[in-house]
């Protein structure tokens, strides 16, 4: 175990365990590491790597093959302030051995990921289900992995009649069916299958958007007016903020202003057309903040073309055989059209934020960014400030530093009249 103590308490952290477990031997290398990274994303499962000086001959003793179990345990805030410990077991996916140029100890790089991706390569089969839901299908696939199934939290989705999968691997099958799920709780149709700090998750973007934020991340001076920081929350000062993307023509063409879905059924020899309009989407599905990205109304930008006659930005043709019971029962039309708009809105705005290492924040959380522009009056940025979803996260640990990098995504901006509201 090693720990870092600083005059600034928020820079304290502890690495309790980095174990490599082979078939016959195990070794602790946390005191030897020179670098470790853990990656989380709403798009998949956790992966990472670490490097260490092999001063005790771990590689040859364990006879590492790149398939060992990796146990990791670390936390920000040493002592009683370690609110959430990052504790997981992974499976190594490969190693690299790099000899020292000066004749010293060699450096070993170990890459690892969630064991589900390893188990995925051992099974290939079709799945057949009757009168069930996507959430139940995912549970069944994960439970079939036996004792090595991952810990999971599955949000309930709507039922459909029957479903037959293609012949494929378990993880690949799960990734191929998540876009067919929908929920009647918040009209959300975009589900994500991902892994955060605690477990594997199957959750709708609607449930993620509705989360309360626990942390305020501030960049720039505090105005002291409390406008942006109402509520009992923790405040973090960002080390660096980079506005990655605010407006992208690709998002417009992908369905930011609306979508049309043609659903065809070879069984019933039928073609169904469903449109999703932007105002209906905002009203019934919802957004993170007060004002949808690139939104204009008739008072600001009058249009002579009625909304029902305006062209739609995205058109897709999809089969719905196997999902014919529920595909077009969403209040706004086909679930695929709503899902596409949710995904497009999620990518409308992106910001990268570096903060002192923090294991209390994980992917899928909502944070409030309080971004102050450097001007004479220290104005808060309405475009950069507001509620953001943690879309991707990277923990970077070295013997003397721990940095967490967040990639934040949002679909909207705050309105100065009601900024900071928790919805």
Swiss-Prot record:
- Functional note: Baseplate protein that is part of the baseplate hub. Involved in the tail assembly.
Q: Which UniProt keywords apply?
A: Late protein, Viral baseplate protein, Viral tail protein, Virion
Listed GO cellular component terms? virus tail, baseplate
Q: What induces it?
A: Expressed in the late phase of the viral replicative cycle.
Q: Which domain of life is it from?
A: Viruses
> What's the subunit arrangement here?
Homotrimer. Interacts with gp5 trimer.
Q: Where in the cell is it found?
A: Virion
Q: What is this protein's record name?
A: Probable baseplate hub protein gp334
Q: What is its main location?
A: virion
């Amino acid at each position: 175990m090693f720990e870092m103590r600083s005059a600034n308490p928020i820079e304290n952290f502890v690495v309790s365990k980095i174990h490599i477990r082979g078939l016959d031997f195990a070794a602790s290398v946390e005191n030897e590491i020179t670098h470790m990274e853990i990656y989380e994303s709403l798009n998949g499962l956790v992966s990472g790597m670490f490097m260490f000086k092999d001063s005790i001959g771990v590689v040859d003793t364990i006879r590492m093959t790149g398939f060992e179990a990796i146990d990791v345990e670390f936390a920000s805030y040493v002592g009683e302030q370690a609110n959430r410990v990052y504790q997981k077991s992974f499976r190594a996916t490969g190693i690299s051995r790099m000899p020292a140029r000066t004749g010293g100890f060699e450096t070993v790089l170990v890459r690892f990921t969630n064991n589900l991706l390893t188990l995925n390569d051992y099974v290939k089969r079709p799945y057949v289900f009757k009168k069930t839901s996507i959430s139940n299908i995912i549970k069944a696939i994960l439970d079939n992995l036996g004792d090595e199934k991952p810990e999971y939290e599955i949000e309930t989705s709507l039922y459909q009649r029957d479903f037959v999968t293609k012949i494929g691997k378990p993880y690949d099958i799960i990734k191929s069916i998540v876009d067919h799920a929908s929920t009647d709780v918040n009209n959300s149709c975009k589900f994500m299958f991902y892994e955060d700090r605690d477990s594997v998750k199957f959750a709708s973007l609607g449930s993620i958007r509705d989360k309360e934020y626990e942390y305020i991340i501030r960049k720039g001076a505090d105005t002291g007016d409390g406008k942006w920081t109402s509520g009992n929350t923790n405040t973090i000062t960002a080390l660096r903020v980079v506005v990655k993307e605010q407006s992208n023509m690709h998002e417009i063409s992908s369905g930011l202003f609306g979508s049309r879905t043609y659903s065809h059924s070879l069984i019933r020899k039928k073609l169904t057309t469903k449109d999703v309009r932007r105002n209906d989407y905002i009203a019934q599905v919802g957004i993170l903040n007060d004002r949808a990205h690139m939104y204009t109304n008739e008072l600001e930008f009058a249009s002579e073309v009625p909304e029902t006659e305006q062209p739609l930005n995205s058109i897709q043709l999809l089969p719905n055989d196997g999902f014919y019971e529920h595909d077009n029962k969403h209040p706004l039309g086909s679930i695929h059209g709503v899902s596409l708009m949710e995904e497009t809105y999620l990518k409308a705005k992106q910001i990268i934020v570096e903060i002192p290492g923090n294991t209390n924040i994980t992917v899928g959380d909502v944070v409030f960014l309080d971004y102050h522009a450097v001007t004479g009056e220290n104005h808060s940025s309405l475009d950069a400030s507001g509620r953001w979803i943690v879309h991707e996260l990277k923990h970077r640990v070295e013997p003397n530093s721990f940095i967490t990098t967040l990639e934040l995504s949002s679909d909207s901006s705050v309105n100065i009249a009601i900024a900071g509201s928790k919805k």
